[in-house]
Amino acid sequence: MNKFELTSAYKPTGDQPEAIAELTEGVLQGVPAQTLLGVTGSGKTFTIANVIANINKPTLILSHNKTLAAQLYSEFKSFFPNNAVEYYVSYYDYYQPEAYLPSSDTYIEKDLAINDEIDKLRLAATSSLLSGRKDVVVVSSVSCIYGMGNPSDFYNNVIEIQQGKAFSRNVFLRRLVDSLYVRNDIDLNRGNFRVKGDTVDIYLAYADNLLRIIFWGDDVDSIEEVDPISGVTIARFDAYKIYPANLFMTTKEATLRAIHEIEDDLHKQVQWFENEGRPFEAKRLQERVTYDMEMIRELGHCSGIENYSRYFDGRKAGSRPYCLLDFFPEDFLIVIDESHVSVPQIRAMYGGDRARKINLVEYGFRLPAAMDNRPLKFEEFAEMAKQVIYVSATPADYELIQSEGIVVEQVIRPTGLLDPIIEVRPSHNQIDDLMEEIQIRIEKNERTLVTTLTKRMAEELTEFLLNNNVKCNYIHSDVDTLERVKIMSDLREGIYDVLVGVNLLREGLDLPEVSLVA
């Protein structure tokens, strides 16, 4: 399928038809930047969905936090149920980056926990983009500007099979291993495959079902999609593309070349430290990099291998890393949601990363090449963003300047809702006052959002409300990404009456059942 099919029970009303027509015309005429200035509740997401359906281009929707990205993903999934709507955010449930604090001589080791489900969704996004189909929407956080593998290496490891075509089983198994699938005949998990005679079962890294390939001699006899629990055949295929199990692909030749280049740069950097009269840093760097190279030779990877990504990608010093934007075709659209927040966030990513890494390089923990494992600079992102629609109720000067006066306004709400009444109340007895307001909402079967200043305050207030028989939960950055989505869904369904959070509840969340924000 290569055409977007918009599915909705509603028709554009209010300011939406005019906004859709203007934005569509702008994109089709090649206008580089436009701004959709829409008040809260005016249906900006529905407008953008209509524009995407009209222009029929692969589209990146960029959001400033994971929670809002998850909500947008859910909305676009409902608008385009028959198209490829993907989700691409950071796959870390917990991430402590490597750092060095010279003032206290403290080295902080990198520590992380990867969410397997989000890793699957990220792989699904890149696989859809490289499949060549046009009807792809990827909803992403700022993760899309962070470094990842070379798309050419990823694409070169795609395995194409056809029913009835000659393909040696042993060659096929070797290709699977090259694509980073792991053989496991006992416990078949995502990214594994098992072999039983002429039957090969592959648990695709980016899907929920197994792919079963049955060989007859050196020919592919059948290709089936199988339910991993029941074993029932769901679908049969004449041809199939198997995408790699990891976003970071390389070859043995590239690995050997990278090791050689790393050792050359190590020698130069050690020499520099010694000439500067810093033998301790020289010794530290020599030991750390030598150990990493031994690990890569023996196991194919090491802790912190991303700091050597420039060598594996074959990039020059200072050049930008590959990122999700490289997986899109030349002609694609970027929609930046809540742009007044998202644009400054994109701008800040490079500086924050550089400030941390500069100490690691300066004190001999990493080679200078570690500086090239980074997010895009804002200028690099702007250069790659050939066509952008900024979406905001309060666009900043940057968006307005970039749009050169092309501002599409959407101020009439299709629902006829008025702006909410804002009251400022004294902090004296604020909890008692809050409890009274919550009870009023509960009696009307409505929901309440409560914002606090800190994560600890959110947790303590939630505990207090629960002790007072209020169905309540909290979300903040320590709550897993997918768990946040479930909690917000539970709020809408009435499992909770109150949701407590910090500033991530501030922009863009669409919760029609909520009638009070305190």
Label each residue range with its predicted role:
Residues 1-518:
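ASCE RecA-like P-loop NTPase motor cores
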